[in-house]
């Protein structure tokens, strides 16, 4: 649907709204995310400003170069994205809720074009998250040692409630926490029914030299863990209250 008020040749006089379904955009070579099967409604009432209300089911987001597992599948994505494409483009995310087999994540915040990869300020909560899947949502820049350890050590668990925050210039990510005013990266949550291998090791399992994590070789597995996972900046802390 489209309408205009005044001179039809003046794009600023136009307003429109439209529904879209199954929108797919491949990831770009410069690392821009891609999407598949996104649905919702887009509208505008002011020049250079757009509002997208998401109502998506069974969609995929692609984050090449950001996560080890760049393809993320979701059973639903809802919420509002507002775009102001003026001299300094800015996107505002409101009540975004993403549901997958790994849990439910909610968030709100902004991204602003401030040069380079821009500046982000987004935070939210997580519910019912599979602890063994946490490594999939830690960005590559956290470093291979940390990613390897989390993937191998955290074998099971349920994060009933958690929170997360990403704030600062993305070119400086991951912020090490020494100067919180420059940027902050945080993921933390309480874990129940956890299972963990504190000293995982790799070993060859085929003639080709392929390796996998060997569980419990150096230390007995801990089970029925109740504790807390805390990732902040480039640091990681896992605290067990009982096991």
What residues fall within each predicted segment?
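Membrane-proximal interfacial segments on either side of biological membranes
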Residues: 1-73, 77-80, 84-92, 103-243
């Amino acid at each position: 649907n489209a309408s205009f008020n005044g001179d039809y040749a003046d794009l600023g006089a136009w307003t429109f709204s439209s529904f879209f379904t199954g929108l797919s955009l491949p990831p770009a070579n410069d690392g821009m995310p891609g999407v598949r099967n996104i649905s919702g409604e887009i509208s505008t009432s002011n020049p250079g400003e757009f509002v997208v209300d998401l109502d998506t089911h069974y969609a995929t987001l692609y984050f090449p170069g950001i996560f080890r597992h760049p393809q993320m599948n979701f059973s639903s994505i809802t919420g509002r994205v507002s775009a102001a494409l003026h001299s300094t483009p800015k996107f505002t995310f409101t009540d975004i809720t993403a549901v997958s087999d790994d849990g439910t994540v909610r968030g709100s915040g902004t991204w602003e074009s401030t040069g380079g990869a821009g500046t982000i300020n987004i935070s939210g909560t997580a519910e019912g998250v599979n602890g063994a899947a946490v490594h999939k949502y830690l960005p590559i820049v956290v470093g291979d040692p940390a990613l390897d350890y989390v993937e191998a050590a955290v074998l099971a668990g349920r994060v009933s409630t958690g929170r997360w925050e990403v704030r600062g210039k993305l070119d400086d990510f991951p912020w090490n926490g020494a100067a919180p005013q420059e940027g902050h990266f945080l993921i933390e949550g309480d874990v129940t029914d956890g299972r963990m291998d504190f000293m995982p090791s790799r070993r060859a399992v085929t003639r080709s030299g392929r390796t996998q994590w060997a569980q419990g070789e150096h230390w007995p597995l801990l089970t029925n863990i109740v504790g807390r996972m805390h990732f902040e900046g480039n640091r990681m802390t896992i605290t067990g209250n009982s096991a």
